[in-house]
Amino acid sequence: KRQIYKRISGCGSGTEYMAVTPWGDLYPCHQFVGDPKYLMGDIWKGVTNTAVRDEFKHCNAYARKECQDCWAKLYCSGGCAANSYHATGSITGVYEYGCELFRKRMECAIMIQVAQNQELAAQGIEVPIQLGSTCNACADGEACE
């Protein structure tokens, strides 16, 4: 069973992983290496610039006003912080070209899945489609809407 997982953050840069230079400097990801604004610390003293870590901690789909009404916001989750930074000057900016590409990829993936399900149905193979999920909060145990 193939699933596309929902997530809040586009990546774990600065929080779940960091880039380490040959000299021991720590950056949120490899795309920020050499930018003094995003130097987080080094391997000897650890993270000393906690403001950068905190900035990346709050970099998610909910931090971007432009993402609020997007149907794909919990799949792309605001995308790559470095792409946003290089396109807009802010890690919470919106890299519009990346958004368009991601939404188109999701649309294509959905259409491919629909086509595959139609082929299976034409062969008489039942393909269950789950429109809701049973949360057991409802007295009748039916799927929530």
Give residue ranges: language-model regions:
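A C-terminal junction/extension of Radical SAM enzymes
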Residues: 1-35, 75, 124-145
